[in-house]
Amino acid sequence: RQHYLRFSVPDTWYIQGQCGLRYDTSVGFADRAGFRCGWSGCLRPFDVEKRMELPIIELPLVAMDITLAVYEKLPAEKAIERFARLLDASETRGGAFVLLWHNTLHDHRAFPGYWDTMEYFLFASAGTAEFVTAARLCEEFELRMVTTG
């Protein structure tokens, strides 16, 4: 992903593709959690000016820890509820829940309860969610594109 989610459509995707990157996870909201692309499944970006698909896969970012802790100012308990609703919405629609978690949330004084939030969310989700790598999501997406055209 691009740091601070700094992104320029479609230029960033072109640059990433030229650098050999297979996928990106920058397309999300910094100030609120949710589905910036309308859903959370893989997609192949499209350059409207050149009228062509770009050679990179976008895995839209659904939620980021800092968004809930800083921008939305949610206490840790409410963040768990919010993550769970977003995960459920992603699963229901067949998407992937891309979560960005920073190591700075280890600071219990600055972000009380947030490290526990991540652990709770991961362990609670383990019974229902399937945890996969971005590489696997890309492989499955490309396979579907080949078989469905």
Descriptions of predicted regions:
Residues 31, 41, 77-149:
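C-terminal domain-boundary segment and adjacent tail
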